[in-house]
UniProtKB/Swiss-Prot annotation:
Protein name: ATP-dependent protease subunit HslV
Reactions that this protein is recorded to catalyse: ATP-dependent cleavage of peptide bonds with broad specificity
GO CC entries: HslUV protease complex; proteasome core complex
Family affiliation: Belongs to the peptidase T1B family. HslV subfamily.
Assembly and interaction partners: A double ring-shaped homohexamer of HslV is capped on each side by a ring-shaped HslU homohexamer. The assembly of the HslU/HslV complex is dependent on binding of ATP.
GO biological process: proteolysis involved in protein catabolic process
Active site residues of this protein: 2
């Protein structure tokens, strides 16, 4: 699988992910870009799960963003509705973290939209719990930037989770 983590701190939101693509217990690729900018660079999105499924969801989510003039929550809820009701979409196995300058969300593989706890930290994927724990400890006990926290959290997850590597893609808003 993978690890995707998002941290919002001091006016910045950062989403980062590793680059490993696995098929069963075999590493197929080590430098996949699982974090991307959508909607003219105003929205960050990262995926965990099946790569082809995630690209389908990226496309669908970007269409929803266009349809709803970039309104993140409305677009996420509309995608989740489609995900639940469309037979083909229901078979997709992926999760997304999406974020803009105002809010961050997880869109789950069963069509739920989840807002973060008060700490504004989100993580998904096989190494998600490791990255989430590390990010929470770093936010609470350091003055590191959101970018530094995401990078350190991914590194910790990559050291523990065999389905996460240390080849990261990290995007942030504002630039």
């Amino acid at each position: 699988m993978t690890t995707i983590v998002s941290v919002r701190r001091k006016g910045q939101v950062v989403v980062g992910g590793d680059g490993q693509v696995s098929l069963g217990n075999t590493v197929m690729k080590g430098n996949a870009r699982k974090v991307r900018r959508l909607y003219n660079g105003k929205v960050l999105a990262g995926f965990a799960g099946g790569t082809a499924d995630a690209f389908t969801l990226f496309e669908l989510f970007e269409r929803k963003l266009e349809m709803h003039q970039g309104h993140l929550l409305k677009s996420a809820v509309e995608l989740a509705k489609d995900w639940r009701t469309d037979r083909a979409l229901r078979k997709l196995e992926a999760m997304l973290i999406v974020a803009d300058e105002k809010e961050s969300l997880i869109i789950t593989g069963i069509g739920d939209v989840v807002q973060p706890e008060e700490d504004q930290i989100l993580a998904i994927g096989s190494g998600g719990n490791y990255a989430l724990s590390a990010a929470r400890a770093l936010v609470e006990n350091t003055e590191l930037s959101a970018h530094e926290i995401v990078e350190k959290s991914l590194r910790i997850a990559g050291d523990i989770c065999v389905f996460t590597n240390t080849n990261f893609t990290i995007e942030e808003l504002p630039n």
